[in-house]
């Protein structure tokens, strides 16, 4: 996706549209820089969260995240619960623990769990470095914890997992037009 920066690409993931429609064009956008082509009843471009809320008003819908910018892109008024981990470097296990508890207690119909640690590592140590791959191994443990919580909640047979990111990176940066910055993994299971 272009531009290969966080708010633009997370908006694309949650809204199912590109910047020419949702209007977010900058890394840290809190509001669209361009007028959104459509607004929902909450004054934001339609999101997957709002579409589910409209279809199933009673649904439990959550979003837990480490990067604070996520809250501007998910339509928090359509969520049942949202939680921001203030400092993922000081408490790297907090998001996985919170997500696991939330899943077991509330059995959400939809939950987004957004980790920021790999992005931080890419900017400090570099992308495609041993440190970056160590961070991904750490993240794999948290994904396993979340999968186990889904199993423990008795939801595994009805769950689809999607693992992706907002953008790639090159050296210690992102936001450019290279293939390494634009391409992301997209893994679906269930």
Model-derived features with residue positions:
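Second-shell loop/turn segments in exported
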Residues: 1, 10-11, 33-40, 51, ...
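Active-site nucleophile/metal-coordination loop of metallo-enzymes that catalyze phosphate/sulfate
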Residues: 1-56
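Solvent-exposed loop/turn segments at secondary-structure junctions
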Residues: 2-5, 19-20, 67-71, 117-121, ...
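Loop/turn elements at helix/coil->beta-strand transitions in domains of secreted/extracellular proteins
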Residues: 8, 55-62, 105-111, 155-161, ...
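Substrate-binding rim/cap in mid-to-C-terminal beta-strand-loop elements of soluble/periplasmic
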Residues: 12-14, 27, 177-190
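A substrate-binding/cap region within the structured catalytic cores of diverse enzymes
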Residues: 36-98, 106
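Active-site His/acidic residue clusters
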Residues: 68-83, 97-141, 145
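Metal-dependent active-site segment of extracytoplasmic phospho-/sulfohydrolases and closely related
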Residues: 138-179, 186
């Amino acid at each position: 996706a272009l531009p290969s920066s966080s708010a633009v690409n997370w908006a694309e993931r949650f809204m199912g549209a590109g910047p020419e429609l949702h209007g977010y064009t900058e890394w840290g956008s809190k509001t669209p820089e361009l007028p959104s082509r459509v607004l929902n009843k909450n004054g934001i471009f339609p999101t997957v969260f709002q579409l589910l809320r409209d279809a199933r008003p009673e649904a439990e819908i959550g979003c837990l995240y480490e990067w604070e910018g996520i809250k501007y892109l998910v339509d928090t008024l359509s969520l049942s619960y949202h939680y921001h981990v203030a400092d993922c470097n000081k408490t790297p296990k907090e998001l996985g623990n919170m997500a696991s508890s939330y899943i077991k207690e509330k059995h959400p119909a939809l939950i987004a769990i957004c980790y920021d640690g790999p992005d931080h590592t890419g900017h400090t140590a570099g992308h495609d470095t041993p440190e970056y791959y160590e961070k991904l191994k750490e993240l794999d443990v948290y994904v396993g914890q979340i999968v186990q919580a889904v199993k423990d909640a008795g939801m595994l047979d009805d769950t689809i997992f999607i693992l992706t990111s907002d953008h790639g990176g090159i050296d210690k940066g992102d936001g450019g037009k290279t293939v390494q910055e634009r391409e992301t993994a997209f893994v679906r299971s269930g």
